[in-house]
A protein has these predicted regions:
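Noncatalytic carbohydrate-binding groove/subsite architecture in carbohydrate-active enzymes
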Residues: 1-38, 86
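Aromatic-rich peripheral "rim/lid" segments of glycoside hydrolase catalytic domains that contact
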Residues: 33-142
Length: 142
């Protein structure tokens, strides 16, 4: 992500008034299902935490908007499970939230003083000891 914002920080990419162009990330998502590994909801939650912290520590990213609150039946049938909640698969024409996934509490607490508590598990999945190992200038107190 920093490669993109570093690129936009070049003089040739700046606005006419010399300002760095900012980025809005939309329709972002991480699946909790894998065709080869099955349920990867811990990886989904860890990926969101990592991505959120990267965005939060980059001054040129203005927004990070997730794809779905609740999984979509048609996407789950294709092993794409992007929501914070599972969906009732028996109601293909309606979106009925069934159960929160691991990502739900990470999402809920990521902007609070409980953030590090709810993302602690992710460091093992990512293979780090502390967030500042992979996020230069990490803002939260570790």
């Amino acid at each position: 992500l920093h490669v993109l914002t570093d690129y936009l920080n070049q003089d040739s990419m700046k606005t006419a008034s010399g300002e760095v162009r900012h980025v809005i990330l939309t329709e972002e998502g991480f699946t909790a299902q894998s065709l080869t590994r099955g349920d990867v909801s811990d990886i989904q939650a860890a990926a969101f935490a990592y991505a959120y912290y990267l965005v939060d520590n980059n001054p040129y990213i203005d927004a990070f908007i997730l794809n779905r609150q609740v999984d979509a039946v048609i996407e789950v049938e294709q092993s794409c499970s992007f929501g914070l909640w599972t969906v009732d698969m028996s109601s293909p024409n309606r979106v009925i939230a069934v159960m929160p996934k691991n990502i739900y509490n990470v999402f809920k607490y990521i902007d609070t003083n409980k953030s590090l508590k709810y993302t602690e598990f992710a460091k093992k999945i990512i293979g780090i000891n502390k967030w500042s190992d992979v996020i230069p200038g990490f803002k939260l107190q570790e």
